[in-house]
Amino acid sequence: MLFRSPPHVRRWFQGLRQPDNPRVSCCGEADAYEADIFEVDGGRYVAIITDGKGDIPNGTKIPVPNHKMKWDEGNPTGHGIIFIGIQGQVYCYVAPGGV
């Protein structure tokens, strides 16, 4: 999905910055997973992976720290996108929808 993105979507990925550390990117498309499903657990947002790859299969639940929620950008992908580091740390989460 993500690696076949049109140029405007690739630029969007490249321009995303971590909400709690705006000098640092959310990382790249390789660190991005679709998470079109979510739940709320005790007031905390939990993203559910819907395009599993590598070590993170479909259905994996990832708690999203509030300070990693990205609300200040649109989202041209049509999917919830979560950026996850090699050790499982969440860099950013962008909710589905938006333009």
What are these regions (language model features)?
Residues 1-2:
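Short, small-residue-biased leader/transition segments that mark boundaries at the very start
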Residues 6-17:
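Short, intrinsically disordered, charge-biased short linear motifs at domain edges
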Residues 11, 43, 89-91:
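Intrinsically disordered, low-complexity segments enriched in small/polar residues
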Residues 17-68:
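Mature extracytoplasmic domains of secretory-pathway proteins
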Residues 18, 39, 74-75, 86:
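A generic structural signal for short, solvent-exposed coil/turn residues
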Residues 66-73, 81:
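Short, conserved turn/kink motifs that form compact alpha/beta structural patches or helix kinks used as
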Residues 75-99:
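C-terminal partner/receptor-binding element of secreted or periplasmic proteins
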